[in-house]
Amino acid sequence: MRLLKFLWWTCVTLICGVLLSFSGAYLYLSPSLPSVEALRNVQLQIPLKVYSEDGKLISEFGEMRRTPIRFADIPQDFIHALLSAEDDNFANHYGVDVKSLMRAAAQLLKSGHIQTGGSTITMQVAKNYFLTNERSFSRKINEILLALQIERQLTKDEILELYVNKIYLGNRAYGIEAAAQVYYGKPIKDLSLAEMAMIAGLPKAPSRYNPLVNPTRSTERRNWILERMLKLGFIDQQRYQAAVEEPINASYHVQTPELNAPYIAEMARAEMVGRYGSEAYTEGYKVITTVRSDLQNAASQSVRDGLIDYDQRHGYRGPETRLPGQTRDAWLKHLGQQRSIGGLEPAIVTQVEKSGIMVMTRDGKEEAVTWDSMKWARPFLSNNSMGPMPRQPADVAQAGDQIRVQRQEDGTLRFVQIPAAQSALISLDPKDGAIRSLVGGFSFEQSNYNRAIQAKRQPGSSFKPFIYSAALDNGFTAASLVNDAPIVFVDEYLDKVWRPKNDTNTFLGPIPLREALYKSRNMVSIRVLQGLGIERAISYITKFGFQRDELPRNFSLALGTATVTPMEIAGAWSVFANGGYKVNPYVIERIESRDGQVLYQANPPRVPVEEQVAADAEDAGNPGDPEHPESAEGEGSIEAQQVAAKAQTTFEPTPAERIIDARTAYIMTSMLQDVIKRGTGRRALALKRTDLAGKTGTTNDSKDGWFSGYNSDYVTSVWVGFDQPETLGRREYGGTVALPIWIRYMGFALKDKPMHTMAEPPGIVSLRIDPVTGRSAAPGTPGAYFEMFKNEDTPPSVNELPPGSFPGSPLPDDEGAPIDLF
């Protein structure tokens, strides 16, 4: 009896001691516990996502893959699987499962250290949101106290929702929705019972039970959970049997971008980090860019096709490496280490036959490459020379060569190589500077250097329109005669002589400015710059957005020796396309928070709406040929009215600054249309459009090739060259390397679009001009042609020439900067 009494009081004492200890711990620790109320407004880390204007995913940035899911959207089968695996008493306890804690305590007494935590789902929520992974008594007590508070303040559904969105499930997947996408490539609601059980088994040990790394352990864990579900009555025998017999079919999935625009994605990422710092990667921001997915795809394909065409004109540089005599397994292992570059897949030649070659691709399949696709592969000697034409496949390849192939639309393979040259393309909406497409190189995987915004290159003759525009705003006209004749500059101090020349090494004598531009006569550009004066010209040109310190203070400026980026060129050319307004290229249209709230809406300077309406409504015809104007059907004013209405309902648009006379922009467009009609841009006539204007550009030794052009819908600039400047080849020019890319792209961009040119502004007249004098022609003058002028710049007739004056002289006597027009 005494013994029983002793045992009774001992138990009572122990229980009281535990209660007192727990109460003391609660009183001591509770003031420092975090507020459970914060869980109602918790902000989980969600990656940054970048989208096109039309909602296509471009890229995702962030360490954690997470897609939050609401409790109402969690499948009941998954809830049952999770409770069976982690906490089958979840519905009944108040945050702490005493039996589980007692079991954990017994293991501690037996082994001397903590083996299992005895944690409920609620306790895991407390740990995941508020505590560390440290294994200690104090942390466990904090966990218990927090769990009790959580159960008092949140519903069971809220607790489960917090849990399934926070847990780490391997392969950078946080939360069950992200895990379903990573392992099965579909949302959690579309998973089978077996697949849900597999994911429910991951929280315990994401690495050990990872189906990609440990399929055997993963299967055992899945089947154990299914058995628990059967015992607990969540599923019947039939569903259990079908689920355990289902094979593990998990594989690694990442959210595939719907649009390949990595250079755009990187531009958006950099801007977001500049705005929000490291939070850009975790706060679930959505960035909607100005890029149109169809135009971006066309731009990427145009650049790749153009570079491959150029590359094949200069011969085959040989295989990337040679692996003769190796086994098939060794070849396959090597291919597994190679990346696809710009859609060009690595392959190893396995056989060489008369009809072509057999190659092994990365999936281990052997496929044929026909001889027809290899005939271009003359040996590369230099950018100016090649070896003899190959006569058979054996002249090009041998077994063991690692080469590149390109999959064609019909499924066949084409023999190719990664181009050595690079390119950039940027296409803008001239009304506001929105970037509609941008390509910064052949392949982002090959090089993330964005040549569209980072490459400072000489633009060559594609810079001349800015010199000519300055001339038109300073007394010159499209009919002004300037002498295309040799000129020599001598630097007496440096004892140097500069003898600029035309590309053809020929000289045409006095010619009108219009002809000089479409024939790209260097001597005329230099003489025009002489007439303007360098400082006056530079002050004028900087209004287009060029940096003053990038513009040389000498007459080589007239030949395009400034250093500029394709982005700067495209932005500057927009001024001609929109009638004289300065717009700034931009790529982010809108930034949204994780819940869809608009945090930022672009409001760039825009061409005034009335100007857009006038341009669309006016049946302006083709200003490039004042003698025979052609009707060009506009898009109508509806689009412009919709733009205006949208702007009025969202924000007050910022009007763009006018930087050149509308008449100057109109006449420049006319002159640049002649570049395509009868000059260096004639290849663009293949598009069969009369509303296109543009200019080629080629620098010394053909180190850079350019083409910039536009209509009223898009301004597009293309550059081609080597990252380390070297010649593209003796017979390569802007018209052979850049213009074909521009034609491919604009052909798609303007497909099914009506002709769209700017309306003729008031204050322009058209006169018949004497080709010999550049003055108004008398009746019956042979070869007289029509030219357009500003009202105040109309030339007098030949009979009105004062004695001793030069025909066509553009500048008044009081502006007599040193000039040698003749």
From Swiss-Prot:
GO terms for cellular component: outer membrane-bounded periplasmic space; plasma membrane. Residues 48-216 are annotated as: Transglycosylase. The keyword Ion transport does not apply. Pathway: Cell wall biogenesis; peptidoglycan biosynthesis. Residues 403-744 are annotated as: Transpeptidase. The chain crosses the membrane at residues 6-26. InterPro entries: Beta-lactam/transpept-like (IPR012338), Glyco_trans_51 (IPR001264), Glycosyltr_51/Transpeptidase (IPR050396), Lysozyme-like_dom_sf (IPR023346), PBP_transglycosylase (IPR036950), PCB_OB (IPR031376), PCN-bd_Tpept (IPR001460). Residues 1-5 are cytoplasmic. GO terms for molecular function: penicillin binding; peptidoglycan glycosyltransferase activity; serine-type D-Ala-D-Ala carboxypeptidase activity. Residues 812-822 have a biased composition (Acidic residues). Residues 614-654, 790-822 are annotated as: Disordered. It catalyses: [GlcNAc-(1->4)-Mur2Ac(oyl-L-Ala-gamma-D-Glu-L-Lys-D-Ala-D-Ala)](n)-di-trans,octa-cis-undecaprenyl diphosphate + beta-D-GlcNAc-(1->4)-Mur2Ac(oyl-L-Ala-gamma-D-Glu-L-Lys-D-Ala-D-Ala)-di-trans,octa-cis-undecaprenyl diphosphate = [GlcNAc-(1->4)-Mur2Ac(oyl-L-Ala-gamma-D-Glu-L-Lys-D-Ala-D-Ala)](n+1)-di-trans,octa-cis-undecaprenyl diphosphate + di-trans,octa-cis-undecaprenyl diphosphate + H(+); Preferential cleavage: (Ac)2-L-Lys-D-Ala-|-D-Ala. Also transpeptidation of peptidyl-alanyl moieties that are N-acyl substituents of D-alanine. Its EC number is 2.4.99.28, 3.4.16.4. GO terms for biological process: cell wall organization; peptidoglycan biosynthetic process; proteolysis; regulation of cell shape; response to antibiotic. The active site is at E86, S461. Cell wall formation. Synthesis of cross-linked peptidoglycan from the lipid intermediates. The enzyme has a penicillin-insensitive transglycosylase N-terminal domain (formation of linear glycan strands) and a penicillin-sensitive transpeptidase C-terminal domain (cross-linking of the peptide subunits). This is Penicillin-binding protein 1A. The lineage of its organism: Bacteria, Pseudomonadati, Pseudomonadota, Gammaproteobacteria, Pseudomonadales. The gene is mrcA.
